[in-house]
């Protein structure tokens, strides 16, 4: 038994928790969708939040030197990534940072590329900013997503792509892109003058011996056209505190990005976010190691159960706590699949089509919950699909 509690289910009802919103009106429904965790938070984060709450004033705040040092230390010790503090830019979230990058480095009507299926806000951010969305389909091979580099280069050139948004580790497929893959991506971007935004928010959640490589550690030359994004919020389940960061080593790109933050009045961050992030990186390493063991156990459980009891094809993730499920072996429409999950199994998974057209007859399962709850979710799915 570990030091930390990953078996208790915190009561999230009545707290305006987005993940559990539908359960508040239908108590039979179990949520296994949006990417946050149903675990008790790291005790030191809770203490930091309580200390903040005990203050008599909740005014404007700034990023302390202690916070900056903790972020630098985390990146250096976990990933061998060393950078000057001037390269660090705090922002309220990774998705707002992506939109800021789109607004800063592209013009309306210009092309932005993403690898689909992928986290839905990528496409949304491109479209709502009136940029031209280019989707480069990932290819499934041996149970993992791969990039078709011939098609990628063709897309970059023919569509005159200005910005490439990469998801590493990949959501929803859980692919941890290796150094060789990132090297090829960087070479293509360098060759064709494409800026790259690397969303690395799941970087800490690599599993089964896989290791994350930050894009800015692959080749020093790549730093000239890269904006790397990350946060403690996904790893430590503190998304509600609203804090993330960009590492932009090219001063020209960084100044342009910061100027746009100021223009959008996005340069001020929650004091709660600063404190929670600092506590997470200072005290959270052991908690994280236990958490990853829990995820590996949960993922193996899902793979084994669905493999034995259903025709659902499971893409076993190399990282993240998200599993991409393929229901195409059943004679279903996308609408019927959603109806079966929501109304018969009484579970909420993310709809595959939200990740792109490649997500047809797929769904994304979140395993970041106590094992007992995960077992109930999965048994409901098994019962529903064993009949078909």
Locations of regions flagged by a protein language model:
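N-terminal "arm"/small-domain region of PLP-dependent enzymes with the aminotransferase-like
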Residues: 1-59
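Conserved N-terminal alpha-helix of the aminotransferase class I/II PLP-enzyme fold
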Residues: 59-92
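Conserved long hydrophobic alpha-helices within structured protein cores
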Residues: 1-4, 9, 65-67, 71, ...
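PLP-dependent class I/II
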Residues: 24-30, 35-50, 83-84, 89-388
């Amino acid at each position: 038994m570990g030091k930390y509690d990953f078996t208790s289910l915190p009561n999230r009802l009545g707290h305006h928790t987005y993940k559990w919103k539908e359960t508040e009106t239908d108590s039979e429904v179990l949520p296994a969708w949006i990417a946050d965790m149903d675990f008790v938070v790291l005790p030191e984060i809770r203490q930091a939040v309580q200390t903040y709450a005990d203050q008599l004033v909740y005014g404007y705040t700034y990023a302390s030197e202690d916070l900056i040092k903790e972020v630098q230390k985390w990146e250096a010790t976990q990933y061998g990534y060393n950078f000057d503090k001037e390269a660090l830019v705090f922002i309220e979230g990774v998705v707002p940072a992506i939109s800021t990058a789109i607004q800063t480095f592209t013009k309306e009507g210009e092309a932005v590329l993403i690898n689909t299926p992928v986290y839905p806000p990528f496409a949304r951010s491109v479209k709502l900013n009136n940029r031209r969305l280019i989707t480069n389909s990932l290819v499934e091979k041996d149970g993992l997503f791969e990039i078709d580099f011939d098609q990628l280069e063709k897309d970059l050139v023919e569509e005159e792509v200005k910005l490439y948004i990469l998801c590493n580790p990949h959501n929803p497929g859980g692919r941890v892109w290796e150094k060789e893959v990132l090297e090829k991506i960087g070479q293509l971007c360098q060759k064709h003058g494409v800026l790259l935004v690397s969303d690395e928010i799941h970087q800490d959640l690599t599993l089964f011996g896989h290791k994350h490589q930050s894009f800015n550690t692959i080749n020093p030359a790549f730093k000239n056209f890269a904006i790397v994004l990350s946060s403690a919020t996904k790893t430590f389940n503190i998304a509600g505190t609203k804090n993330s960061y960009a590492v932009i080593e090219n001063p020209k790109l960084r100044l342009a990005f910061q100027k746009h933050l100021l223009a959008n009045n996005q340069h001020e961050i929650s004091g709660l976010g600063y404190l929670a992030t600092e506590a997470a990186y200072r005290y959270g390493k052991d908690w994280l190691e236990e958490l990853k063991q829990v995820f590996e156990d949960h993922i193996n459980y899902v793979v084994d159960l669905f493999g034995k009891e259903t025709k659902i094809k499971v893409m076993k993730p190399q990282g993240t706590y998200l599993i991409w499920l393929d229901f195409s072996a059943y004679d279903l429409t996308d609408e019927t699949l959603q109806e079966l999950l929501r109304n018969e199994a009484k579970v909420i998974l993310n709809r595959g089509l939200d990740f792109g057209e490649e997500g047809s007859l797929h769904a994304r399962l979140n395993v970041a919950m106590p094992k007992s709850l995960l077992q109930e979710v999965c048994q409901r799915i098994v019962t529903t699909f064993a009949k078909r």
